[in-house]
Amino acid sequence: MASDFWLIAGLGNPGKKYEDTRHNMGFMTADVLAERWTVNFADHKGLAMLGKSVMNLDGRTVKFFLAKPLTYMNDSGNAVASISAYYQIEPDHIVVIHDDMDLEFGRIKVKAGGSAGGHNGIKSIDRSLGTPKYARVRMGVGHSKRGANAHDNTVNWVLGGFGPDQRKQLPEFLADGADAAEDIIFHGLAKTQEKFNGR
């Protein structure tokens, strides 16, 4: 029987050296949610830091798990699939938060299904769940210079930090990402897309 819990997974890479990098937008947004809803993380089978709590919004209450995979980005699917199988959470009750180079810094787009857009964490989750039909909060980080060394530029870009201006805007951006995850759960995908995708 499917659980009535939701699973929110913020993607990133574990370890100090990745802490404030663009690729860790998901982790950082998960931390905002953890603070808002008093989530205490504990280890889940060595695959993720996982906590659970309850959200109370608009007179409704929703139980949820919050996960930060420890598998490194490219194997995020192992963690997400393990949690969803263990707690019987269906893909339509999963929200994944991740960085997205196709969007400028500060922009958020919400979607379910469709292409992974070259994001290895999303490709891994699609593979492990056997479907792309879960909700995604795409957090814009802009993109590196194209050109001869495009792959290396991309790797250096996503594993790089934020400039001073972006760092100033980051708290508000992360709060918006957390709002988007909550809105998907409480108001559904279409309404959340209307609110965020046109900004």
Curated annotation (Swiss-Prot):
The keyword Cytoplasm is annotated on this UniProt entry: yes
One GO MF term attached to the UniProt entry: tRNA binding
Function summary: Hydrolyzes ribosome-free peptidyl-tRNAs (with 1 or more amino acids incorporated), which drop off the ribosome during protein synthesis, or as a result of ribosome stalling.
PROSITE patterns in UniProt: PEPT_TRNA_HYDROL_1 (PS01195), PEPT_TRNA_HYDROL_2 (PS01196)
Entry GO CC: cytoplasm
GO terms, biological process: protein quality control for misfolded or incompletely synthesized proteins; rescue of stalled ribosome
Active site: H23 (proton acceptor)
Protein name (record): Peptidyl-tRNA hydrolase
Oligomer status and interactors: Monomer.
Keyword RNA-binding: yes
Catalytic activity line of the entry: an N-acyl-L-alpha-aminoacyl-tRNA + H2O = an N-acyl-L-amino acid + a tRNA + H(+)
Cellular localisation: Cytoplasm
Binding of tRNA, residues: Y18, Y72, N74, N120
Source species of the chain: Bifidobacterium longum (strain NCC 2705)
Residues annotated as site: Discriminates between blocked and unblocked aminoacyl-tRNA: N13
Gene name of the record: pth
Pfam families linked: Pept_tRNA_hydro (PF01195)
Similarity remark: Belongs to the PTH family.
Major localization listed first in the record, in broad terms: cytoplasm
